[in-house]
Each structure stands twice: as C-alpha cells, then as structure tokens.
Regions:
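Short beta-strand scaffold segments in enzyme catalytic cores
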Residues: 92-96, 105, 224-228
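Conserved beta-alpha-beta core of the PfkB/ribokinase-like small-molecule kinase fold
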Residues: 133-203, 223-225
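Conserved phosphate-binding/catalytic loop of the ribokinase/pfkB sugar-kinase fold
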Residues: 84, 95-133
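Glycine-rich phosphate/adenosyl-contacting loop at the front of the ribokinase-like
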Residues: 1-58, 63-77, 244-245, 309-310
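A glycine-rich helix N-cap at a beta->alpha junction
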Residues: 74-87
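Short, conserved phosphate/pyrophosphate- and ester-handling motifs at nucleotide-, phospho-/glycolipid
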Residues: 46, 183, 252
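Conserved phosphate-binding/catalytic region of the ribokinase-like
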Residues: 4, 27, 171, 198-310
Length: 310
C-alpha cells in the first residue's frame, strides 16, 4: 500500500530575523536551505510516519534538483517516478519569518511544473490507480489537475489549495476531490462564500461536502480545525497549544500528511483529524520545515498529551 504525490518538489530557503523586521533594509537573521514543495513535504511527512510514499514531480538537472532527490531519499521518499529535465531550473521557494517565527512574505518560482503535463499524468495512470491515496497541489496547471482526477478512478485524491491565488485554479474542481485542506481564506475561494465568521466557515465547508468532497478539513491555526464530511459529520477539533512555536511554515503540510495517514489507516474522521492536528504540532516545534522527529510513535504521544482525551 503506497500513497502517491503529484506536484511541487523544490528547494526551500527560509530566513528568520533575530529581531523585529525593518522593512527596506538588511536584517540579521538565520538562513536555512532544504528540500521542499507542498506535495513533496506532505509525502516526506508520510514517509516519516511509516507510509510507503512515492512522488511524481519535475526537477531540473541542477544542484537544487540533486539536493531534492538526496534529501527525499534519505527520508524514505521514493522520487524514482519523477522527471529530471536538462535545461530547466528546479523550482524554489523563499520565505521570510519575523522574530516570532510568523511568515511575513514569501516568493516562489514554480515554472518548471509547466512540464508536468496531462501527458505525463497519462503515463502514470496505473501508478495513480494502484495508490491508496493521491496527494496533489494546484501549483500544477488546471488541465493537469483535471487529468489526475480523471485518471484516479476510485483512488481518493487529496488537495492542499496552497494559497488563495492557487485555490482559484482548483475551485471549479473542488467537489471532485476526496479531501480538501484549506484555511479559511482558501475555503472562501473554493466555495465562493464568505468565511469571516464561524458560521460562514461552517456553511462554506458544508457546501463543498454537498458538492462531492468527502473530507473537508479547514485549518483554523491555533483554534484547530473544522471538519465537514460527506456523511454529515460536522465538528470542531483542537489540541492544546504547544509550548514554543519555532517554525510555522511546515504546519499545513504536516497537517495534511496526518489527515491522509489517518485515512489510509482506516480511522474515523475524528481520529484522522487528531492525527492531522498532532502532526501540525510536531512541525511547529521544529526548526525545520519537516520535523526530523516525525514518527507514528510521536504522533500517538502528541495526541495523548495535548488532547482532552490525554
């Protein structure tokens, strides 16, 4: 049983200021470089949780591409189905964090993903249909996203909308995904509804479930998650806050990995959301985008120690 990721794999460069950011000036801080990409990060988290994880992406024949492949292999993520193309540059993502580890601004160059075409998806059709689940992101073109859904058959497809801009690309297809993991802003775009209040979030999430999405897990930051399922499930879920937030950039990727982990393990929606929240907790307590401590055992420990059930 394996989970397949189709989407972004890139190099992340994160800068965290040592003091309050001074705009339009050089700020002393700490810089870290690592393999990244929304879908790749989700898949590495799954690999660290003990799930067989495979990845389809496009890399350049360059140093960044080699870094992505070597770090992924070291974590147990199989990149052998990905393409390495000469003459193109591996995608990159740069983020700037303030002294409290909150992201101020980010920039990405994902143009290499233009080479991950519907034809590439067609060539991976059997791989897609053999997966327990597929994870993708809208950094891919709209036609490629649609081809993934067309090719999946009965294989559940999960999507991280990534941002409000990318969510617009996925919005017309939102009801065809098995699982969606938006924040409230991305939810507003996917559903075409206001989400400024709790009632708005609930209505928007329910509308996506009514359109066909089986699992809508809305990330609410420190407030946890609101879940709407096709089976009528509607609930809020949260864990107690972590002691120290060290890096918030990987929390969303870990959250989706925890959700997919719970799904492929056959858990109830409540338990799967607990896995998602716990994975997010583990991520924010790490200096790295993906915690090197991520494991199924630590996931269980975190649920036990941070939930009201503990």
């Amino acid at each position: 049983m394996y989970v397949l990721g189709i989407g972004a794999a890139n190099v992340d460069v994160h800068g965290m200021s040592r003091a309050a950011i001074v705009m339009r000036d050089s700020n002393p801080g700490h810089l870290r470089t690592s393999a990244g990409g929304v879908t790749r990060n989700v898949m590495e988290n799954l690999a660290r949780l003990g799930v067989e994880a495979k990845m389809v992406s496009v890399l350049g024949d360059d140093l960044f591409g080699e870094l992505v492949k070597s770090e992924s292999a070291a974590a147990g993520l199989d990149m052998s189905e990905s393409l390495t193309l000469p003459g193109v540059t591996t995608s990159a993502y740069v983020s700037i964090l303030d002294e409290r580890a909150d992201m101020l601004v980010a920039m990405s160059d994902m143009s290499v993903l233009e080479h991950l075409t519907p034809a590439v998806v067609d060539s991976k059709r059997e791989l897609i249909r053999g997966a327990a689940a597929v994870v993708c992101d809208p950094c891919l073109g709209a036609e490629t996203l649609e081809r993934i859904l067309d090719s999946a058959g009965d294989t559940p497809v999960f999507l991280d909308p990534v941002s409000t801009a990318y969510a617009r690309r996925a919005a017309p297809l939102a009801g065809r995904f098995y699982g969606l993991k938006p924040n409230s802003l991305e939810l507003a775009v996917l559903a075409g509804m206001d989400t400024d209040t709790d009632e708005g979030v609930e209505r928007a999430a329910a509308s996506l479930a009514e359109r066909g999405a089986k699992c809508v897990a809305v990330s609410l930051g420190e407030r946890g998650c609101y879940f709407a399922g096709a089976g009528g499930e509607r609930f809020y879920r949260a864990l107690r806050p972590v002691g120290e937030m060290r890096n918030a950039t990987g929390a969303g990727d870990a959250f989706l990995a925890g959700l997919v982990y719970g799904f492929v393990k056959g858990m109830s929606p409540e338990d799967a959301v607990d896995c998602a929240l716990a994975a997010g907790h583990i991520a924010v307590e790490s200096d790295d985008t993906i915690s090197r401590e991520m494991s199924a055992l630590l996931l269980k420990y975190t649920i036990r120690n941070y939930s009201d059930k503990g």
